[in-house]
Each structure stands twice: as structure tokens, then as C-alpha cells.
Amino acid sequence: MAELLGIYKCAKCGNIVQVLHGEKPPVMCCGQGMDRLVENTVDAAVEKHVPVVEKIEGGYVVKVGSVPHPMGSDHWIEWVELTSEDGMFIQRQMLTPSDAPEATFKTDAEKVVAREYCNLHGLWKG
């Protein structure tokens, strides 16, 4: 069964999707169910993957890791997402290997959660 705002990856082709509406049926790709990605479950350097959220005037800056995550053509952060605790605000910033591992979001939401996706080490939440 699909989870609202869940991130799913196809084990066959590597497609990644996020469920924005509905909770049924299971998310399918390549004729099979997609795997739900669970945050912070890959064995990797936590200090380089857990997003760090900083409140700034008019919004937030999300830095990937307390130690900056490497950004190279073979290992990088693909995107950073900020969601309000109530789920009413969702914004994602796509990154390239030449970008810094951070993103700025404009919102007046008081309580937020950040997630990021590393091309090698999966989904992380902070």
C-alpha cells in the first residue's frame, strides 16, 4: 500500500516517485511493486547525510550533513526537500554535482522537516 508523501524506487530501472495523493494501490513500475525508501537506514556516514535545518529570515537553509557532503559526478545529492510538519507546504530543490550540498526555501512554516536523496546512499531525513 502506498504511503502519502512516501518515496518509492523501482529495483529494476531505478525510477523514483513520490506519492502526492491517495494511499492505494501499491506503486508499480516495470511490472512490479516499487520499494518504499526508508530514511536513514543505509550504512553510510551520518555526519555527511543527515540534513541540518537552519532558520533564516523568511525561511530556512538546509545543509546536507554537519560535514558537507561531497558533490562529484559519481556521488552527489540529487535533491533536497522541505516539508511543513502539517504537510501543507512541500518544496524540493534539485541539485547537480557542481552545486553546493544545500538549498534555501522561503516559507513562514514554523515546524519543518527536511529530507535529501544521495545517489549512492539513498534517502535521509533530519
Locate the predicted segments by residue:
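Cysteine-rich micro-motifs
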Residues: 23-34
